[in-house]
């Protein structure tokens, strides 16, 4: 392995470590309540090292949000991969539920940003996210024209999927309390995922 390749791999590993720590701390404290020193401590690195990779807190915050959205948009690639709506919607819901299970802090960072008026994401929502959503909407409308699904407002369908799947991350503490103070077991979470899939498919006659 060349020295250059090794440097690139080290950089990627360090950036991933910092982003994971930042996702957690931003989710807990919010943007204003977070200092880069808090993130550095969570990552187990000196603050100077953090700023070597991310010059400012704002840069880091934007990168965290970008990574979250990139993964969410990648989950919807099922709309292109699968020709049948049942397969596409099933895979999409499962991917979203898995993200909420594995990356609850990511979902909460996003929720905090939106609930605060999207000061950082505002322009991004009106461009990148809107373009992506419009592609999903066109696919859903095509399914309707082809009579593969019952008529449905594509925006309402997407919002319903987002609200339900992200609930398992954003309101995890509420679920724990209502579940007798225990996290949902892997088995129970799989059952919940299948139930959400069933409800989504049923909403469009599948």
Task: Describe each region flagged by the PLM.
Residues 1-13, 20:
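N-terminal intrinsically disordered/low-complexity leader segments
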Residues 62-91, 136-142:
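Amphipathic alpha-helical linker/stalk segments
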Residues 101-123, 171-180:
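Amphipathic alpha-helical segments used for helix-helix packing
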């Amino acid at each position: 392995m060349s020295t250059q390749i090794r440097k690139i791999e080290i950089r990627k590993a360090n950036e991933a470590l910092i982003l994971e720590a930042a996702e957690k701390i931003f989710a807990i404290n919010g943007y204003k309540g977070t200092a880069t020193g808090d993130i550095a401590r969570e990552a187990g690195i000196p603050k100077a090292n953090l700023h070597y990779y991310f010059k400012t807190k704002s840069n880091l915050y934007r990168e965290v949000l970008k990574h979250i959205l990139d993964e969410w948009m990648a989950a919807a690639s099922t709309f292109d991969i699968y020709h049948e709506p049942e397969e596409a919607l099933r895979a999409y819901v499962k991917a979203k539920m898995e993200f909420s299970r594995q990356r609850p802090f990511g979902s909460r960072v996003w929720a905090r940003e939106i609930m605060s008026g999207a000061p950082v994401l505002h322009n991004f929502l009106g461009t990148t996210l809107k373009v992506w959503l419009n592609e999903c909407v066109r696919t859903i409308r095509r399914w309707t024209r082809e009579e593969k699904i019952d008529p449905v407002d594509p925006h309402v369908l997407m919002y319903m999927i987002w609200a339900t799947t992200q609930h398992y991350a954003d309101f995890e503490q509420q679920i724990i309390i209502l579940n007798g103070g225990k996290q949902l077991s892997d088995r129970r979470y799989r059952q919940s995922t299948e139930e959400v899939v069933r409800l989504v498919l049923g909403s469009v006659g599948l």
